[in-house]
Amino acid sequence: MALLPLAGATGLSACDPSRVYENNVDLKSPSGDAYVWDVQQRPSFTFAIADTAARYDVYFNVRNASGYGFYNLFLKHTLTGPDGRPAGPALLHQMVLMDPKTGEPRGAGAGDIFDHQFLALPGQHFAKAGTYKLTLEQYMRQNQLPGIMAVGVRVAKVGGK
């Protein structure tokens, strides 16, 4: 229920021939508090790559409440290949969710909820066919991060074919 607008956007993209994978997960603290991203919670997303000649754009989806206490979100991703080994270095990403000067929310909003899609890995080449796992980790300076409602991953073939 918490992912209705983001899920709706995902449903609309079902006709998108470039989309290889998209999934989003709701976040909650270990004690069950909704919309809290705990530093120990590392959502993983598993997707299959068949065409190793193609390039792929990898996006990170973020849903936040307007009460989120920062203008940005740092997260680190780890990509694991079909052989279970790292498929490149773990990278740190900064996503700007609100204007740093005005505090005005960015992204698509409905009420006090805002959805963002950030191009994190443009033109990614996957060297081996098979199943990949992408793990996200919040990299802010507090263990409990209230106001981040959901995160997700989208993988799309560059050129839409």
Predicted regions and their residues:
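C-terminal motif of bacterial Sec signal peptides marking the signal peptidase cleavage site
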Residues: 11-14
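Bacterial signal peptide processing site
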Residues: 16-19
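Post-signal peptide N-terminal segment of mature Sec-exported envelope proteins
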Residues: 23-44
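A beta-strand/beta-hairpin structural motif
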Residues: 41, 93-98, 105-121
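Short tyrosine-centred short linear motifs in exposed loops/low-complexity segments
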Residues: 53-56, 118-120, 124-138
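Short beta-strand-plus-loop segments that form exposed binding edges in beta-rich domains
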Residues: 61-63, 136-142
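Short coil-to-beta strand junction motifs in C2/discoidin
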Residues: 69-75, 147-149
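Edge beta-strands of jelly-roll/beta-sandwich modules across compartments, strongly enriched
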Residues: 141-153
